[in-house]
Design a protein with these regions (language model features):
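Bacterial N-terminal signal peptides
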Residues: 8-21
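Carbohydrate-active catalytic/glycan-binding domains of CAZyme proteins
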Residues: 20, 25-486
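Positively charged n-region of N-terminal signal peptides that target proteins for export
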Residues: 1-6
Length: 486
């Protein structure tokens, strides 16, 4: 998907990398990590830039671990704490709100994303009409875990909260739902908003051109208005009080009190979408200084009238705070060729050996580190980064020259990099013609100007000026350490 670039201005983007033991943040030395997702990430452009996203690829098959991953936190020794859910469904047909489903929270550790050691049960939920959905996230400020589970009753899907101070000892919060809404959710902590963010399905009355199994309700005063799936973004400082607090009530109208959320609280398809598109599920996560979300899209089908149709595709969304979302990559199927066997993610990524990894039961999917999104060009183009304080370190570039979608441009593709001072003047010795990259595809290309390194400029405020053709630029980093993803 390509997004034409308007002029934009961005302020300083620097980062403190965090190593976590059970998610407890330990500050390290300042590190540069510049990502490129939208026009907000570039300054003073020339030419035609576009922004894109990378679909996941299958890394390898793996044995199902007996649980579904929900939250992954890096440990100081390079391994990862993994929290997830083991779920067992009541075999009785049409059990519905009388179902006797069982679930438990589990903890394990991993070094490779497929082998899980030290597996233990940390909480066993009461038997009941639970769904198999789980959201689990960690607030490093208060050092508290939050888990959200859905429990069915005649009103619909009640969102129930569970808390833990250490990931091992969990307590149910209150004997009532936080709110009611649709039967799908994602959950993560936004360090920018200082809030838990819940990305949940909700239902909107809508005139569907092709009707599927979506319900209708007499309260809508129009039998042609049918439920379509859209998203709602809720947030909470502490996981106990949520905004918005409104509920999707009596979703099956069993109590005669059906009520949808107000339309202004919904994230709905827009004029750039197919008219029958629906947002079936969204699972987001924090990555460095922004959040990404994998959204599962759906559309009814004329081949299956009044029945559930196949899922349509998946999509990458991006946000600077977890609350307001952009959709610049609509034509990219986020989970790649694993769809429709894999229709969404269930956890924030593991970052192992230069890869962003997602476990999907019997497959491990991945993307090279920092390559979820990129800025690129077809012909010649230029842009500057936001200004940043140069650390005492070398700079590295994550780039593909030529871009993967333009292998025929191998001989003509290039990236050139210059360094500008705080006045926008080229720093002598760091002119762009001294740093030229061709026929390279690497996440950590050393940026050198002859025999010189930007390390010489440590302590100064600088910007990089990029010149590119038929290339993708994913990130600029200092050092080789990982990035916190929550």
């Amino acid at each position: 998907m390509r997004c034409d670039l308007p002029f934009c201005t961005v302020l300083v983007v620097t980062h403190l990398w965090f190593a976590c033991d059970f998610g407890v943040a330990q500050p390290a030395a300042p590190e540069v990590r510049l990502l490129f997702s939208t026009s907000q990430d570039v300054q003073n452009p020339w030419g035609r830039l576009h922004f894109g996203a990378t679909p996941m690829q299958k890394i390898r098959d793996c044995d199902p671990p007996g649980f579904t991953l929900a939250c992954c936190l890096p440990r100081a020794d390079g391994s990862w704490d993994v929290y997830g859910q083991a779920f067992s469904r009541d075999a009785a047909p049409e059990a519905d709100t009388r179902a006797k489903n069982t679930w438990k929270l589990v903890h394990a550790t991993t070094r490779d994303g497929t082998t899980f050691d030290n597996l233990e049960t940390v909480y066993a939920g009461a038997t009941g009409p639970w769904t198999d959905h789980l959201g689990l996230a960690y607030n490093p400020d208060t050092r508290e875990f939050l888990a959200l589970k859905l429990l069915m009753d005649d009103n619909g899907f009640g969102y129930r909260a569970f808390f833990s101070a250490n990931g091992r000892d969990w307590t149910a919060y209150a004997d009532k739902p936080l709110f009611y809404d649709g039967d799908s959710l994602g959950l993560f902590w936004s360090p920018v908003s200082k809030r838990f963010v819940c990305t949940n399905k909700t239902l909107q009355p809508y005139l569907k051109h092709i009707q599927d199994h979506g319900g209708t309700h007499p309260q809508n005063n129009n039998d042609q208005l049918r439920d379509r799936r859209v998203l709602a973004i809720r947030s909470s400082v502490d996981g106990r009080q949520w905004e918005p607090a409104e509920s999707l009530m009596d979703v099956w109208n069993r109590l005669g009190s059906y009520r949808a959320l107000p339309a202004e609280l919904m994230l709905t398809p827009d004029a750039d979408d197919p008219p029958d598109l629906e947002h079936y599920r969204g699972v987001g996560f924090w990555y460095h200084d922004r959040s990404y979300m994998v959204v599962l899209n759906y559309a009814a089908s004329a081949l299956t009238p009044r029945k559930h149709a196949p899922q349509l595709d998946t999509e990458w969304w991006v946000s600077r705070n977890g609350l307001k979302w952009e959709r610049p990559y609509r034509d990219i199927n986020a989970v790649g060729d694993s769809f429709p066997g894999v229709v969404c993610i269930t956890h924030n990524p593991l970052l192992i050996d230069g890869m962003i990894l997602f476990h999907t039961g019997n497959q491990l999917l991945g993307i090279p580190q920092d390559r979820i999104s990129f800025v690129g060009s077809r012909a010649n183009a230029e842009f500057s980064t936001a200004p940043f304080a140069m650390p005492k370190a070398d700079l590295q570039l994550n780039a593909a020259v030529p871009a993967p979608e333009r292998p025929f441009a191998k001989q003509q593709a290039y990236v050139m990099v210059g360094i500008l001072d705080d006045q926008g003047t080229v720093v002598p010795g760091f002119e762009p013609d001294k740093c030229v990259l061709q026929i390279v595809d690497q996440i950590d290309l050393p940026l050198r100007w002859g025999d010189r390194s930007a390390r010489e400029l440590s302590g100064r405020t600088i910007r990089l000026r990029f010149y590119l053709r038929s290339a993708n630029i994913y990130a600029v980093t200092s050092g080789t350490r990982g990035v916190h993803a929550g």
